[in-house]
Regions:
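Charged, amphipathic alpha-helical segments and their flanking helix caps
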Residues: 1-19, 39-133
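A short, polar/charged loop/turn motif at coil->beta-strand junctions and beta-hairpin connectors
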Residues: 29-32, 47
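A short, hydrophobic beta-strand-centered structural micro-motif
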Residues: 31-40
C-alpha cells in the first residue's frame, strides 16, 4: 500500500463513501450524500503535511430523518476518537504515515457550503511521513 491508498483506506473506514478531492466530481457527476472528501499528498520521510477533509450531507425536505448538524458533529467526533491523542499510524511500503490532530488549529468546524440544503464539517489533520515502522 502507498500513502495515497493508506489515506483512502483511512477515510473509507467510517461507513461513508470517501473521495479524494481531485476525483470527487469525476466525469461531472456529484456523489450521493452523505460522503467524505479529503485532500491527499505524497511525502518523503520526515515531511509533515497539513491536510483537510470534509463530511458532507444534504437536507431533504421530503424526509424527516434527514441530515443534521448533530449527526455531522457525531461523525467528526468518531473520526477524532479514531485518530486519538497519540495519532493513528498506518504501514506504507517500507515506512508509514502517522495521522494526527493538529495542535495549532481546531480539528473540526462547520463550514458554509454555498447552498442552504448542504451541510459541511471541515476537519484538519497532520500527516507525518515516517520510515521504518
Amino acid at each position: 500500500m502507498d500513502s495515497w491508498q493508506a489515506l483512502n483506506t483511512f477515510w473509507k473506514g467510517f461507513g461513508l463513501p470517501a473521495y479524494d478531492e481531485q476525483t470527487v466530481f469525476f466525469e461531472g457527476r456529484s456523489p450521493a450524500y452523505p460522503h467524505i472528501t479529503y485532500e491527499s499528498a505524497s511525502g518523503i520521510n520526515g515531511n509533515t503535511e497539513l491536510l483537510s477533509a470534509s463530511i458532507w450531507d444534504r437536507i431533504d425536505p421530503d424526509v424527516s430523518d434527514t441530515a443534521s448538524w448533530s449527526w455531522l458533529k457525531q461523525k467528526a467526533e468518531e473520526i477524532k476518537n479514531t485518530i486519538g491523542y497519540g495519532g493513528k499510524k498506518m504501514v506504507v511500503g517500507g515506512g508509514g504515515i502517522w495521522i494526527k490532530i493538529p495542535e495549532t488549529s481546531p480539528f473540526a468546524r462547520p463550514m458554509p457550503s454555498g447552498a442552504d440544503d448542504i451541510l459541511r464539517i471541515k476537519m484538519d489533520i497532520e500527516v507525518d511521513y515516517i520510515g521504518g515502522l
